[in-house]
Amino acid sequence: MTITYIHHSGYLLETDQALLLFDFAEGTLPPLDPAKDLFVFVSHRREDHFSPKIFDLAATHPRIRFILSDDIWQNKVPEHLHGLSWFMDPGNVLEWKEGGGLRVTAFKSTDEGVAFMVETGGYTIYHAGDLNNWRWNGEELAWNNNMSTNYRRELEKIKASGFHPDVAMVPLDGRQEDLFYLGLDDFMRIVGAEMVFPMHFWEDFSVIPALKKLDCSAEYRDRVADIRKDGQRFCFPAFPDNRSGGETT
């Protein structure tokens, strides 16, 4: 499987039979193999995660399906694509036979929309959307504590569901200042993943080496992808001599 970081929270994953496009709102999309089924995921309606331009892909990729958070208004979807679009609430599970078989489970965000857990081609893939430990300096302590409680509760639900992702895409947001690492750290400690790909860092790639320097990341830092630019492409499983990245381009 290949993983391409597009921009912000946008990722393209390619398996032998399917293309999985997550939260593509900005950036340059890599070439898409027309012989493969394309599944387009949108975690919520905010413009840094959702752009109506995704629907233009149907013109050049007829084997397409849209899996959208239920907070996205249905009138945002062109009428001729209604039959190719599904809306998910937290707790929903959807399955397709196409693309080698695909099963999607939605979890509740601590902000808007949903997080996605996708099982396909022998892989388990997690995209957090805005499910994160959104603690902020200057916010009331009770609000922050409630945020952490809700986030960890949702992670425990994921763990209790038996999921252990091969690949996880999780926010690492420098706007949280010294609290930037909390959500990803919680995720790796409670759920875990074979490889974790940071996202939602607003072009501040420095948060990735900053995370790896923290003592708390000692147990998993070699499983954090070294993303340095938009369009960077990785392999999973990663090359044995470069597990922390597996970069191909």
Q: What does each of the following model-derived ranges do?
A:
Residues F41, R103-A106, A168-P171, V196-P198:
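Short catalytic-loop micro-motif centered on adjacent basic/acidic residues
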Residues E26-Q74, K159-M169:
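Active-site metal-binding motif and surrounding structural segment of the metallo-beta-lactamase
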Residues I67-S69, F107, A128, P198-M199, ...:
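Generic beta-sheet signal
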Residues F39-V40, D56-T60, W143-N146, D185-M188, ...:
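Glycine-rich, phosphate-binding/catalytic loops in enzymes
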Residues G27-P30, R46-F50, I72-K76, V93-E95, ...:
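Active-site environment of divalent metal-dependent phosphoester hydrolases
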Residues T4-H8, V77-K97, Y181-T249:
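Binuclear metal-ion centers of metallo-dependent hydrolases, dominated by the metallo-beta-lactamase
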Residues M1-A35, S85-H164, K229-T249:
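Core dinuclear metal-dependent hydrolase active-site scaffold
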Residues R152-I158, E177-D186:
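A short, acidic, amphipathic alpha-helical segment used as a generic capping/interface helix at domain edges
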